[in-house]
Regions:
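A short acidic, Gly/Pro-enriched loop at the edge of an enzyme's catalytic core
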Residues: 131-140
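A short SAM/SAH-binding and catalytic strip from SAM-dependent methyltransferases
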Residues: 139-154
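Short alpha-helix
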Residues: 210-235
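Core SAM-dependent methyltransferase catalytic element
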Residues: 227-229, 248-268
Length: 268
């Protein structure tokens, strides 16, 4: 996978997304907007982040959050083009399942896994909704740069908890909320957005539109707790070795503050 595509995912930081417009939280409208993005130019505009990368400058090889997944049943939320499912398949997971809001993304996943000699059960649905995924079934549920698209964080975490066996593990990554507030300007880091502002906004990028909300870190932590998870590990640090390969404003920013966060939680 192209490293540049990994890096593009984190471009959604303060001062780097163009002109954001505040919008009302209308679930159907947000789903339609974001589904259209991923059915058309999502990969071209935003890029793809997939295992072994959790985001820019963070990798599973360094973090070792999954451990041995051989014989394990795995579900990916927001499976994108299938690279993370392929990674788990190569590590001998016994069952691969993937969910995505975009049928176009799922078709890419089918084609990609077929070329890799793998298969997965794929479901097209928003992550917030009931979609026939079995309960108390999976050893791992994971999401690489997808959870932040949900319109109902606590509801999504409750659904994910229902899919997991007791003591099952949920791992996800997303843009760090501080990254969304700070921009690198003239060799300085400048706050451009209020950290506490969780309102929804739309951004136009290359004739396409996306709609998001930038949630506080505490919002994720509290939603996990309410859904019956206990957090085992949270990672904010970037990998120095990966950062050394780049010399631009984004990598300089990543040396000063977190751009990605990862949480590993266990179902009680």
């Amino acid at each position: 996978m192209d490293n540049n595509s990994v890096n593009r995912t984190n471009i959604m930081g303060a001062g780097e997304v163009g002109c954001a417009i505040s919008v009302d939280m209308d679930r159907d409208s947000i789903h339609n907007t974001n589904k259209t993005l991923w059915d058309t130019k999502g990969n071209e505009i935003i890029g793809t982040t997939a295992l072994p990368f959790y985001g820019s400058f963070v990798s599973e090889e360094k973090c070792q959050l999954f451990g041995d997944v051989s014989g394990k049943k795995m579900l990916e939320i927001g499976c994108g083009s299938g690279q993370s499912l392929q990674y788990q398949g190569e590590h001998k997971a016994s069952e691969l399942w993937g969910m995505d809001i975009s049928e176009n993304q799922l078709e890419k996943t089918r084609e990609y896994l077929t070329t890799c000699g793998l298969s997965a059960k794929l479901i097209c649905s928003p992550m917030e909704e009931e979609c026939g995924i079995p309960e108390d079934y999976f050893d791992f549920v994971y999401s690489i740069y997808a959870i932040g698209w949900t319109t109902d964080l606590e509801g999504t975490f409750c659904r994910i908890a229902s899919y997991l066996k007791k003591d099952g593990v949920f791992i996800f990554s997303w843009s760090h909320p501080i990254h969304k507030c700070v921009v690198a300007e003239n060799d300085m880091l400048v706050f451009k957005k209020c950290y506490f502002d969780e309102s929804w906004y739309s951004v136009s990028l290359d004739e396409s539109t996306l709609t998001l909300s930038d949630r506080k870190l505490s919002t994720y932590v509290n939603a996990l707790s309410k859904a019956g998870f206990v957090i085992e590990q949270m990672i904010e640090e970037s990998d120095d070795e990966i950062m050394q390969s780049r010399d631009d404003n984004f990598s300089k920013k990543a040396k000063m503050l977190p751009v990605t966060f990862i949480i590993k939680a266990r179902k009680l």
